Amino acid sequence: MLKATIQKFQYGKNIVTIETGMIARQATSAVMVRMDDTSVFVTVVADKKEKLGQKFFPLTVNYQERTYSIGRFPGGFFRREGRPNENEVLVSRLIDRSVRPLFPKNFFNDIQIIATVMSVNPQVNPDIVSIIGASAALSLSGLPFKCPIGSSRIGYIDNKYILNPTTSELIDSKLDMIVSGSSNAVLMVESSSNILQEKNILEAILFGNEQNKIVIENIDKLKKKFKKENLEYDLKSLNNNDIQFVIEDLFFDRIKDSYKIPEKKKRLEKIENIKNDILNNFINNNNTNEEEILYIIQNIERKIVRNRIISGKPRIDGRTEDMVRNLDIHLGILPRTHGSSLFTRGETQALVTTTLGTERDAQNIDDLVGDKIDRFLFHYNFPPYCVGEVGIISSPKRREIGHGKLAKRGMLAVMPDIDKFPYTIRIVSEITESNGSSSMASVCGASLSLMDAGVPISSSVAGIAMGLIKEKDKFVVLTDILGDEDYLGDMDFKVMGTREGVTALQMDIKIEGITSEILQVSLDKAKNARINILNEMDKVIKKPKNEISIFAPRIYKIKINPEKIKDVIGKGGSVIRMLTEKTKSSIEIEDDGTVKVISTDIKNAQCALKKIKDITHEIKINKIYVAKITRISEFGIFACLINNKEGLIHVSKIPYKKFSDINNNFKIGQIISVKVIEIDRYGRIRLSFTGTDKNKNKKFFNKNN
């Protein structure tokens, strides 16, 4: 009989259970993790041998949601899950970024982590459960995974930090932060916040990592219970000191000189030439392979750049550690877009556009933890030309989806409420040049583009990427890092915010030993840089434009009696179809009686609004109206009021002495004045005749029809 090894523990207000040994026994390792009713099954499979010529660590993470987990059928024609949705991509990245730093640099075997969501309590998000599951599965796998990690979601409600807040609690929380880390170090942070101070952000990170120790202790206990032996893997030795000594002796000065070239393109060309010279000299003559040589060159590059920075010398492009690259800002460069900006920071450039749409343009998101409508879209594109390469243009990659979501988090806190600005907003950031921090350039460009579009954001937002060089007890925090400083450094810490506080951050750390002091210095330097950038942005545009673009749709709202909605729509949609065609406007009606008229032409919109008001006008007893005669009969006159409602003037309500013969005194199409005397339970209107002031009445009738 199959028997599982189980570890159960309290984690905040949740009960977490980790089981292994009963399901998917042919995988390298597999665990089922439950947090209350949310269950995620995580497997790890690793190849025994690395692929020939492998030059990087091929870790693949697939987080996949199953709709059966909430008792529903998938949408679409085939009624089964298809390509990964945005949330699946984002959670896959969270898992990857949390565990990747804990593998040896010389481990190149293929590893695949699959996290399958099997049951969901809508109040418990599966993302944290998945990261815990990946940590547990890797710890039980026998792979060279350094140590278990924990992961936690942190909220901030009523000035208190909350561990793993529910979906409902997050609505009132000023913070939504995920912290992953080992018992010694924070490894990954992802957060959005409602303009919190740096002090609160630091406290939340430290609080989260302290809570992570609960998970780590229990994974260690499970590991002792399960007692799986470590697998034998051939960890390639890439440290050939003899060859490195020779390469350094012959090429060190050339490599060092190349890192004095501030322009990225020229520097990369010089380094590429040096690499080719080294490979030509050593591969054929010294019984070495290309991977080993490239690893040695990387070590030399790392040593040169890091020693230069740690000793206080200028960085690759000549800047000091706290300097932001030169900024160049332009607005409205694309005349037919609703808003646009070109934001350039050094050799990183983002062309950002804003498009305004209606509620119909909003994105319907079918989520496991609750369906929602997203009226703010942020798309980030990273074409190959931005780094001077030839590449394949395809659907958005994981990195593009992740960067777009990060930039969106940075902007959310300043976006207007739907009641104040009833538009769906789409921002697109086209990265036209890249040398580090392109996602942060997207945030700055988005803020500028929104203001150019006349979107009433509450404040400007800027983003900055911080880096770290740490050697033993010495460390230097770098402001506005280049691509090479990210690649050769120890940290990538992106911070977004206004002058008042932080709106979002993302942190990936490659080493252990990141102290609270380093985090504090990073946040303080990021604040200074952010304010400097905001000062430059304010010189170009300080507040949103008063008017939206003439090419953007105008949205006009009126409220009608919900019972009149059927009159505006008409039988089979005939009335609303006629209105949209005649006024060249789009009309949206909500159940509460809110009517939106959308048009780029104000005259057309006003015409549509007037017609809707006429249709929904409620006729009142004892009020005098202008009417047009539609029929004449022996017993009276039928007349149409301004809202196309027909009423009867009985002959008894027409002065007999003055109009003894109604056929001779009245004609069809004549404008008359009437008084409403009764509306019966069937809606039939009884009128009395009050006059025939032709000029005045005709003018009034034409004005109102």
Curated annotation (Swiss-Prot):
Coiled coil spans? none
Binding-site list for Mg(2+)? 486, 492
**Domain S1 motif, which positions?**
622-690
GO molecular-function terms, A-Z: 3'-5'-RNA exonuclease activity; magnesium ion binding; polyribonucleotide nucleotidyltransferase activity; RNA binding
Q: What is its main location?
A: cytoplasm
> What GO terms describe the biological role, i.e. biological process, of this protein?
mRNA catabolic process; RNA processing
Q: Which residues form the KH domain?
A: 553-612
What does it catalyze?
A: RNA(n+1) + phosphate = RNA(n) + a ribonucleoside 5'-diphosphate
Q: Where in the cell is it found?
A: Cytoplasm
Q: Which UniProt keywords apply?
A: Cytoplasm, Magnesium, Metal-binding, Nucleotidyltransferase, RNA-binding, Transferase
**Cofactors per UniProt?**
Mg(2+)
For this protein, what is the EC number?
2.7.7.8
What are the GO cellular component annotations?
Answer: cytosol
Quaternary structure, from the entry? Component of the RNA degradosome, which is a multiprotein complex involved in RNA processing and mRNA degradation.
PANTHER family xrefs: POLYRIBONUCLEOTIDE NUCLEOTIDYLTRANSFERASE, POLYRIBONUCLEOTIDE NUCLEOTIDYLTRANSFERASE 1, MITOCHONDRIAL
Family the UniProt entry places it in:
Belongs to the polyribonucleotide nucleotidyltransferase family.
Q: What does this protein do?
A: Involved in mRNA degradation. Catalyzes the phosphorolysis of single-stranded polyribonucleotides processively in the 3'- to 5'-direction.
In Swiss-Prot or TrEMBL terms, this protein is called: Polyribonucleotide nucleotidyltransferase
